[in-house]
Structure formats: C-alpha cells, structure tokens
UniProtKB/Swiss-Prot annotation:
It is a multi-pass membrane protein. It comes from Penicillium sp. Keywords: Glycoprotein, Membrane, Transmembrane, Transmembrane helix, Transport. PANTHER family: MAJOR FACILITATOR SUPERFAMILY (PTHR23501), MAJOR FACILITATOR SUPERFAMILY (MFS) PROFILE DOMAIN-CONTAINING PROTEIN-RELATED (PTHR23501:SF177). The lineage of its organism: Eukaryota, Fungi, Dikarya, Ascomycota, Pezizomycotina. The gene is grgE. SUPFAM superfamilies: MFS general substrate transporter. This is MFS-type transporter grgE. MFS-type transporter; part of the gene cluster that mediates the biosynthesis of gregatin A, a fungal polyketide featuring an alkylated furanone core. Belongs to the major facilitator superfamily. The keyword Transmembrane helix applies.
Length: 564
C-alpha cells in the first residue's frame, strides 16, 4: 500500500512501502498531519517493506546454526523460569514461611510475560529487531539477579515480574528472528527445535531446581540464567543481522510510544492483579463475601470493561488489534492456547507439591519423578515439529493432542496417597505426549497466515494467550488448593489450626504436625485433586476450541493470510 493511500476506516495516511514519487517534504507533512489529528500511524501498515525476506537473505550454514542455537538458549532460560520454580517452591515456602503467596511466584512472571507481549511485538516493529531482543534479554537478566538476592517474598515477586517483562521481549523476538531466518516451509522444523529447548528446560528444570534447593540454595535457580543469557547475547550480537523485511518504521518517537498502548498494558496488569488478589484473599485471609474480595472482583469486571472500550477506541494502535483478532487463524489458536497452556502449567506447578508433600520425597527426588513427563515433552517436541513440516497437517494434530492430554490429566486426577509408581509414571507420559505434540502448532498457524509486517504481532498474541492462561490458571488452582484443603482439614484433623497449616511450608508438614499427619495429608490430597480437576477442565475445553481452528494445511499459506 503506497503512502498516499487512505484507510477508509481511519481516514489517515498509511505508512507502507515507500512511493518513490513522494518527496521527503510530503512525508513530513503527512507525519505532522497525523500528529495534529492526535492519532499515530496505523501500525499494521507501518513497515518499510511488507515482503518476507528474499531467498538470498536467509542465513545459511554456520550463521543459521548459531542463530538457532542462540534462540534455543534464550528460550531455554525463559522457559526454565517457568519450570524450575515448581520444584523450588516447597523450599521457598519454608524460607519465607507460608503458602499464601505461592501463586504469585508463578503468576508475577506470567503476568508481565503475557501482558507485555503485544507491546514488545510492536517494539520490534518500531525499533531494531536485534537491539530490542538484546535489551529484552538484559532486562530478563536483571530480574533474575533480583530473584537470586531477594531477602523476602515481595522482593522475589518483584524480580519475577521484571524477569517476565524481559522474557516477553525475548519470546516474541526469538520466534520473530526464527521466522525471518528460515524459509516458510522449513519454519515448523526450526520452531520445533526451539520447542525442544522448551522441552529441555522442562527436563532440566525440576532436576536443576531440586539439586539447587537440596544441595546449594534455591537462589541458584535464578543465578543460572546469567551465564546462559550472556552467551545467547554474544551469539546474536555477532551472527544475526536484521533482514530488509524487518526494518523498523520511520515515525516520530511520540507516535511509536503511542502505538505501544501502555495504557492498555496497564489496564491488563491491573486486571490480572485484581483477579489474583481476589483468589488469594478469598476463603483464606478474608471471607468470600468480605468487602475486600467483592471489591476486587467488581474491580476486575470494571477494568475488563474499560480495557475493551479503550482497545476499541484505539483501533489500529491498540494492544489488541481488532482487525487481526477477527481472523479465525488467530483467535481460534489463541483461545486454544490459553486453556491448553493453563492446564499444563497447573500440572507443572503442583506435581512437585504432590511428590514432596504426599510422598515425602526430596526436591531432587521430586525432579526425578517428574522425568516421565518432561522427557516425553522434550523428545516429542522435535518429532512433532518434523511431522508438521513434512505434512503441513496442523489442526488434526491439535485435536488429537488435546484429547490425549485430557485423558492423561484425567488419570492424574485419580492419584491418591500411596499411588504406585507404575501409575504416576505411565499417566505422566500419556499427559506429556498429549501436551507436547500440538504445543507449537498454534504459533505455526498464526505465523503461516500472517503478512511479514504482522509477524511479530501475531507471535506476541500466541504468547499472550499462553502466559495469561498460565497466570489465571495457576492463581485459580492455588485458590482451589488452599480453600479445599482448609475445608477438608476441619474434618480430617480438627485439632490443626488452618492458619498454621497455610503458614507451614509444604516440606515441613510432617515435622510441624507429627500427630495429625494422616489427616493433614488427606487435606493436602483433597486440595491437589481440586487443582487437577481444573487442569482436566481446561484442556478439555481447549480440545473443543480446536474444532474452530481452520483445517487448511500449512504448506502454501505462508506469507499471506490464506484463510480468515
């Protein structure tokens, strides 16, 4: 679209492929006209080039190898921050004395990781792809350092939030770099390789978290990010060069900032905080009908309405662009990913609690018992990526994966005190296989049906859905866990003070309540079953949402919205 064209919906000049007949003065006049109208240039047309990289621009050989390696390292550490904490949480609750803030250890990271996805996606549109990725990595490293030195729970939560902000930029930028570095037909293979880094972090996370928590300190769960992230930064600095299709928009800084939609991001953050706090207080420190809990829930609804109105008002500048969200190739896989990822993260955070509290294993032992799930996840990620690359089949794989995951999580729900090894090994393998085979397919579908200028934005939307699913699901699961446990303890161990139980770390319940341990374990198990039930429901709903995803093969649709 040439610069002199007009968007009929906005009646504003669009910044598209440069028209050589347009003078520099004309360009300046158009920019000034936009500024006087109080609107920034519509972001979806704001590219120097709407084309994917030319064939000779794709890196090859050693350069491609190192670029993919760097993105795998970056993916490894931002994913490790999601998987390593689950095993470390019982030890963290011991040091910071309580279960009341457990949901924040995961949700603070998911909140900023998800909330800033679209803004970071736009940052890659308006600023250098390479520079923005490196700055995001630096922010992530700062957050990890804060987590490592945190003197209390609040400092740890703050560090997690900062790390999530950096992780948002790294995730969007990493997959955008892969998209611009690989030909469309080979893209599923490389995203599968990056997915294997996620799987590797899933394998290493519980083991590393358990080893550090047992033998050194849980703080090393965060220190480990520093050298790995530094290596990834050096590789990107040397080997990656932004292609012509990824040139940033030439627009005034004010317009770039306006298009980041920081108001929308702030509303989303407030929305998530209200939800988490309501679930944290409800039934634990406050009754569900208390003014504080009701106020938070009312605030959640009010902010949600305000966010919808604000996003509609901003139009093309919004964090959530209506033009893109109307496409079935984006909203269907995004919704699928919200529920699918939410279900997985519940298992990721609560299986270690099951093993360490119910089975009385050490953190290392808990990590070892998680291996059936995480090893399956790692191996199957590569196989799934290769299959999709070879066949182009996407939606059927999503449905089959979600169906298998539903069966697997349903079987995990049947676990109880003293469940034999054969069941907790086999059920984890089944669930993991179901979760991994479709994990990256929503990303493949969104990218294969996006124009070059929309690549980073649609990538961000998938990550937004994934991480918000994690934030909401982990918070809901924690609320269900604690409330169910407190209700159950009144009958299984009536002499135990419920508030004392909440204030006791998951690995200390036997030492703290030796005379009532059987009743405490029954209460813990009831709470864990409540979390597993939520996991089953979410992945089951994801399976239904998969039916709405377009059934076209990915081959032949890359680079230009094949279906709407």
């Amino acid at each position: 679209m040439a610069e002199n064209q007009v968007d009929p919906k906005r009646n504003l000049p669009l910044y598209g492929a440069a028209d050589e007949s347009t003078s520099a003065t004309d360009k300046e006049d158009e920019v000034e006209n936009v500024r006087q109208n109080g609107s920034a240039p519509p972001i979806e047309e704001a590219r120097e080039s709407n084309e994917a990289p030319a064939a000779d621009e794709y890196p090859h050989g050693l350069s491609l190898f190192f670029i993919v390696l760097a993105i795998m390292l970056a993916t490894f550490i931002i994913s490790l921050d999601q998987t390593i904490v689950g095993t470390a949480i019982p030890k963290i609750t011991d040091q910071f004395h309580g279960l009341d803030k457990v949901s924040w250890y995961g949700s603070a990271y998911f909140m900023t990781f998800g909330g800033f996805q679209t803004s970071m996606g736009k940052a890659y549109r308006y600023f250098s792809l390479k520079t923005t990725f490196l700055v995001s990595l630096f922010i992530f490293e700062i957050g990890s350092l804060i987590c490592g030195v945190a003197p209390n729970a609040n400092a740890l939560i703050a560090g997690r939030a900062i790390a999530g902000l950096g992780g948002a930029g790294m995730a969007t930028g990493g997959f955008t770099i892969i998209a611009f570095s690989s030909e469309p037909k080979r893209r599923p293979l490389f995203t599968g390789l990056v997915g294997s880094a996620y799987g590797l972090s899933a394998v290493a996370g519980p083991l590393i978290g358990g080893a550090f928590s047992d033998k050194v300190s849980w703080r090393w769960c965060f220190y480990i990010n520093l050298p790995v992230g530094g290596l990834a930064a050096v590789i990107i600095l040397i080997f990656f060069h932004s292609p012509s299709g990824a040139k940033p928009v030439k627009a005034p800084l004010k317009e770039k900032i306006l298009n980041m939609d920081l108001v929308g991001v702030s509303l989303l953050m407030c929305l998530i905080i209200c939800f988490i706090l309501a679930l944290q207080y409800g039934g634990q420190t406050e009754s569900w009908n208390s003014s504080k809990v009701i106020g938070l829930l009312v605030g959640f609804v009010a902010i949600l309405v305000a966010l919808i109105i604000w996003e509609y008002y901003l139009g093309e500048r919004a964090m959530l662009v209506g033009r893109l969200l109307k496409k079935r190739a984006l909203w269907a896989p995004s919704t699928y990913m919200f529920f699918f990822a939410g279900s997985y993260f519940i298992l990721l955070y609560y299986l270690p609690t099951y093993f360490q509290s119910i089975d009385d294993t050490s953190p290392i032992g808990s990590g070892v018992r998680n291996l059936p799930m995480v090893v399956t996840f790692s191996i199957a990620a590569i196989l799934a990526g290769a299959f999709v690359e070879r066949t182009g089949i996407a939606t059927p794989v999503m449905l089959v994966g979600a169906a298998i995951a539903t069966i697997g999580t349903g079987l995990i729900y049947t676990w109880d005190i003293g469940t034999p090894a054969g069941k907790w090994i086999g059920y984890q393998i089944l669930a993991a296989f179901g979760f991994v085979i479709p994990w990256l397919i929503p990303m493949n579908i969104a990218q294969a049906n996006a124009d070059a200028q929309d690549m980073s934005t649609v990538t961000a939307y998938i990550f937004l859905a994934q991480t918000l699913g994690g934030a909401f699901s982990v918070s809901a699961a924690q609320s269900a866990f604690v409330n169910t446990m407190l209700t159950k303890i009144k009958t299984t161990a009536p002499d135990v003070d419920p508030m004392a139980l909440i204030a006791t770390g998951a690995t200390q319940i036997r030492a703290t309540f030796p005379n009532d341990i059987h009743g405490v374990l029954l209460a813990y198990m009831a709470g864990l079953k409540a979390t597993f039930a939520i996991s089953v429901g979410m992945v089951g709903f994801a399976c239904l949402m998969g039916l709405f995803t377009p059934w076209n093969r990915l081959h032949g649709s890359a680079g230009g919205a094949a279906f709407a």
